[in-house]
């Protein structure tokens, strides 16, 4: 079983760089966005809340694996440092998490939507997303072109 470690966003980039260099965690297996809900007074001290990310890292040298969790309780402007300068594979995944959860990755070279249209309002994987608040209108256009023999 792999170790699971929580890191505050402010220390994330430095700690990930340390894991890459000192622990030889050279392979980013996955990076997944999460919405653990709103923090509550009755939560146990070790319960993760807010919007965040889980990183699964592996060392191809030692075979060691670790999962890193980080989160922010700021639901209005959630920000987490980018690790795309450490693992290039994070580039695509961070854009996906931004698209679906609205988490902005500080330092990312191209932080824009990946799957959803630019005029899409909200982030569909968040627990506070209510698709009933807006009407989504799809407009499909199809151009027909008649091809006549001999022309």
Residues covered by each model-derived region:
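Terminal low-complexity/charged segments
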Residues: 1-151
């Amino acid at each position: 079983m792999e170790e699971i470690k929580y890191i505050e966003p402010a220390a994330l980039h430095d700690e990930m760089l340390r894991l890459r260099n000192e622990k030889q965690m050279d392979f980013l297996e996955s990076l997944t966005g999460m919405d653990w809900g709103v923090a509550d007074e009755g939560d146990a001290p070790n319960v993760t809340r807010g919007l965040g990310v889980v990183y699964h890292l592996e060392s191809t040298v030692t075979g060691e694996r670790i999962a890193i969790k980080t989160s922010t309780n700021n639901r209005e402007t959630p920000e987490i440092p980018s690790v795309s300068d450490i693992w290039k594979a994070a580039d695509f995944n961070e854009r996906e998490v931004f698209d679906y959860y609205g988490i902005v990755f500080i330092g990312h070279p191209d932080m824009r939507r990946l799957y959803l249209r630019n005029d899409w309002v909200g982030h569909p994987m968040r627990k506070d997303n209510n698709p009933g608040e807006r009407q989504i209108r799809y407009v499909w256009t199809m151009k027909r072109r008649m091809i006549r023999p001999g022309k």
